[in-house]
Amino acid sequence: MPKLKTRKAAAKRFRATGTGKIVRRKAFKNHLLEHKTTNKKRQFSKMAIVNERDEENVRLMLPYL
């Protein structure tokens, strides 16, 4: 059986925590930041845990995560 391939686009966007959860970056933090409050920008800087419904698809894209 051939080796499973990793989706490289997904590999750049997701990481696994020590407990096995998958984390991602939040959106809305790349540009047009002038009108956003400091509090909102700080919240967007934090990592978010991938929803359990989406986690199944992410794990299929990253077989060696």
Curated annotation (Swiss-Prot):
One of its GO terms (molecular function) is structural constituent of ribosome. Pfam families: Ribosomal_L35p (PF01632). PROSITE patterns: RIBOSOMAL_L35. GO terms for biological process: translation. GO terms for cellular component: cytosolic large ribosomal subunit. Coiled coil: none annotated. Keywords: Ribonucleoprotein, Ribosomal protein. The keyword Nucleotide-binding does not apply. The keyword Ribonucleoprotein applies. Belongs to the bacterial ribosomal protein bL35 family. This is Large ribosomal subunit protein bL35. The lineage of its organism: Bacteria, Bacillati, Cyanobacteriota, Cyanophyceae, Nostocales. The gene is rpmI.
